Each structure stands twice: as structure tokens, then as C-alpha cells.
Amino acid sequence: MAGSHPYFNLPDSTHPSPPSAPPSLRWHQRCQPSGATNGLLVALLGGGLPAGFVGPLSRMAYQGSNLPSLELLICRCLFHLPIALLLKLRGDPLLGPPDIRGWACFCALLNVLSIGCAYSAVQVVPAGNAATVRKGSSTVCSAVLTLCLESQGLGGYEWCGLLGSILGLIIILGPGLWTLQEGTTGVYTTLGYVQAFLGGLALSLGLLVYRSLHFPSCLPTVAFLSGLVGLLGCVPGLFVLQTPVLPSDLLSWSCVGAEGILALVSFTCVGYAVTKAHPALVCAVLHSEVVVALILQYYMLHETVALSDIMGAGVVLGSIAIITARNLSCERTGKVEE
């Protein structure tokens, strides 16, 4: 037959053959977590979990050596100063570019105010409750401010997870607010909750300002400025407002050191996460700090954890699971190994 002749078996240039299908990609090449998912996972594992240890460790240092919040804040700021070596090695200015130096310092000031309010609150209210109020206020304020200033909305699943996490915080906090003691103790407790709320507000503002900064080495610059601004503001007050106090035993020194390291890790991870995902979602995922703080409050500080705390923690974890699962999207790389 003519079709069997080699001549007729040559490829026809007038009818190009369909493109060959690309070779099958491996799973890790076909799918990879999106940027938002990476940010949320970093916020969960590197931001929320280490931060959950900060409050109980600070409470232990206060109980062991009567270490005030001002000294705790100064010790934490000291851990930020070695970042100057990294900036020097990279040849970057320590205070950031001159045109946005003021905003970088303002962001650092907001971070210091947030941390200071958190340390003051944790000394008069349970660590879990202080973390609950701070994270709840930061989540709500981040959602409102981002929607108003950046016009960046959320999807249905995100709102469901966000509102669910806030509901969990209300379940944790509600019974405690109804049983506030009267008199001086009740006033100090109320002020502690107010400080925790203001700390969350300052945190949300700091995250929004940080998102607006775009220059190389933004994260290490803001981290160094936070330590510098904190020291410049706290060291004079250390000698004016009170008598300086140092940790009196090895346990207190260990708590201060561990708290400073874990806080720096959490600060760095949150700074990375907020550039990848919505600030409100990052703050919602950081509610894992509350769950960790409640666990440590029971096992380390031997403070009572009510049934409402356990129920609220379960709601928070479920909401975090919804947010994380919604953002666990797979993106095709579109690249084929040669």
C-alpha cells in the first residue's frame, strides 16, 4: 500500500503535530503553598506558639524576683540591639533610609508601647486573659483599619474564621469580666484589661505601618529600632519612676533570657507574615498564643483554668483551622524540569 511507503510516512509540515504533553511533574513541583499560606504558617508556628511562653515566663520572673514590667521591657529590648551587626555587615543604615526614617521609628514606638502594655497587664491579670484581650483587640482593630485604610477585604471563609476566633476569645474572657472584685483589687484588674486592650490596638497600628514600609532590610531595621526606642524611653524612667530591680535568682534570670529570645523569634516571624497575608488573618492565627498561655498558666503557674477557657480555646483552634485550610491553596508552578 502507498501508505506503507517510507515516503508517505514522513511528517507533514503543513499540518503540525499537536504539542506533546509535558511530562508529569512531581507533587512538590505541581503544588506549592501560596504566599498567604506561608505567611499564616509562619505566624502560627513561629509567631503564636513562642509568644504563648512570653506571658507565663514574665509572670514567673515577676513572682520570683518582683521584677517590674519596666525591667522586663528593657531586658527584651536588649535582645534587639545585636541586630545592628547584621545591618552593618549588609551595609544598610541602622535607622533606615532618611526619607522614611520617621515612619520606621513610629512603627518601632508602637511596638514598644504594645509590648509595655502587655507586660504591665500580665502582672495584674492572668496571663491567658491578658493575651486574650490583647489578641482580640488587635484582630478587630486590624480588620477595621485594613478595610478602611487599604480597602483590603476578606472572603466568606476568612470572616467566618475571624469571627469564630473572636467568639472563642469572648467565651474565655466573659466569665472573668463578670466576677471582677470591687475595691482596689478590682480597679487594678480593670486597668490591666484596659492596658491589654491598648496593647492590641498599638500592635494593629504597628502592623499596618510596617506593611507600608518598603525598603531593603525593613524587618531587621524595625527590629533594631524597636530595641533602641525602647531603651531610650525606658532607661531614664528606670531611675526616675522607681528603684532599679534585678533578678534575684537563677530561675528569674532564666525566665528573662528565654522570654527575650522567644519574643524576638515571634517578632521576626510576625513581621514576615504580615507582608504575606492579611493583617487581621495574621492576628487571628496568633490567637494560638492564647491557647499556649492557658496551658502554661495551668501547668507552670498552677492557676485555675475554667471550663469556659477550655471551650473558648477549642473554638479558637477550630477557627484557626478554618483560616489555614482556606488558605492552603495549591499553585501550579508551570515549570517543567529540563
UniProtKB/Swiss-Prot annotation:
InterPro entries: EamA_dom (IPR000620). It is a multi-pass membrane protein. One of its GO terms (cellular component) is membrane. Expressed in placenta and testis. It holds the Pfam family EamA. Residues 49-174, 272-325 form the EamA domain. Belongs to the SLC35G solute transporter family. This is Solute carrier family 35 member G5. The gene is SLC35G5.
